């Protein structure tokens, strides 16, 4: 049953309904693709990201020419373990950059591991727990260090910590902290 409204309340609409037409305009921020700065034209932002990632996987291969680093053939992409499937690669976590298309689909390279002094002190403070450690590492590892610095094997560096052994893996602008149980 509808509630009995009297007077001006009968014509009153809810607070989220008053500008529904305005929200459909193309210059609204959620209706514009942030990368190409174009209106979405009937597609959601997730569809656009999936479309761009699919187009990126079929682009020219990277210099180097082996089948793992470039988007050279669909069969290589399907069978290669170094590629995430596109649905998993854009599950809200991976930004799609038009200028870094093909490397964004590559799985994390074990050689791209680095350490930072802020990170090391954060890992040494084991009382903060792994959530605080993750935040510190996200703040501490810059993009160029995570991309180009080869810091060696980081898992063995923290094996002598009394409470927790954490291995830190940086790939692109994502840093993964995995907790390993001590035996």
Curated annotation (Swiss-Prot):
Residues 54-89 are annotated as: Disordered. This is Uncharacterized protein IRL14. The lineage of its organism: Viruses, Duplodnaviria, Heunggongvirae, Peploviricota, Herviviricetes.
């Amino acid at each position: 049953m509808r509630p009995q409204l009297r007077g001006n309340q009968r014509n009153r609409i809810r607070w989220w309904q008053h500008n529904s037409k305005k929200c459909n305009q193309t210059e609204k921020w959620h209706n514009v693709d942030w990368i190409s700065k174009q209106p979405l034209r009937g597609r959601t932002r997730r569809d656009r990201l999936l479309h761009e990632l699919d187009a990126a996987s079929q682009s020219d291969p990277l210099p180097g020419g082996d089948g793992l680093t470039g988007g050279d053939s669909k069969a290589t992409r399907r069978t290669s373990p170094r590629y995430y499937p596109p649905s998993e690669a854009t599950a809200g976590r991976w930004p799609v950059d038009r200028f870094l298309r093909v490397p964004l689909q590559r799985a994390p390279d074990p050689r791209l591991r680095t350490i930072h002094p802020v990170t090391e002190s954060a890992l040494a403070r084991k009382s903060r727990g792994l959530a605080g450690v993750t935040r510190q590492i996200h703040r501490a590892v810059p993009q160029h260090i995570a991309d180009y610095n080869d810091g060696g094997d980081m898992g063995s560096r923290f094996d002598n910590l009394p409470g927790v052994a954490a291995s830190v893996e940086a790939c692109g602008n994502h840093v993964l902290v995995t907790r390993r149980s001590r035996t």
